[in-house]
Amino acid sequence: EEFGGQDLNDVLNLILLLANEPKADTSRMGVYGFSRGGMMTYLLLRKSCQFKAAVVGGGPTDLLKWIPKRPEMETYVYAELIPDYHNNKEVELKKRSAIYWADELCPTTPLMILHGSADWRVAPENALELLVKLFELKHPVRFLFLEGAQHSLAEFRQEARNSIRSFFDHYVKNENPLPDMELHGR
């Protein structure tokens, strides 16, 4: 457990295991992570283009900005779990913060980001700032900002589930091509 360090390899190794499963089709995989799992999903998309689609719900994208809003995260999570944290705080946090390397996310993996506007655990600005960067990079991204929703999106649970399923069906199950991200239309 390194909060986004070597523990990422556990997920990548699962793909190798799946390749040996007769019922698994590793040419059509999606990945979904929520909260800390969302951070892990961004890290996966930085290392691999094996996924047909990815969904992140309530994922932190800038751990440095998170410290003033959630100081307990530094004390009980970062300092406890991240190797060499005290000597290389900024470097280690940026390694785990997609906002600093959005241009390194797999460009062929469409991404859906969900976030609640009333999320106190992971500030909504995390999603909004990354969305702007992804838009500038012309990365295929779908964004669902749920008004008044808390971190778990409990107020819109069914809507969120339906949106996620539709997104995965579109890109993973039905294998639709990536959208044209250039300006077009009349």
Feature-to-residue mapping (PLM):
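Short beta-strand immediately N-terminal to the catalytic nucleophile in serine-hydrolase-like folds
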Residues: 31-33, 57, 114
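A conserved short beta-strand
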Residues: 50-62
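Alpha/beta-hydrolase active-site loop
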Residues: 2-22
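Alpha/beta-hydrolase fold nucleophile elbow
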Residues: 23-35
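Mobile cap/lid helix-loop segments that gate and shape the active-site cleft of serine hydrolases
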Residues: 6, 59, 64-104, 136
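C-terminal catalytic histidine-bearing segment of alpha/beta-hydrolase fold enzymes
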Residues: 125-186
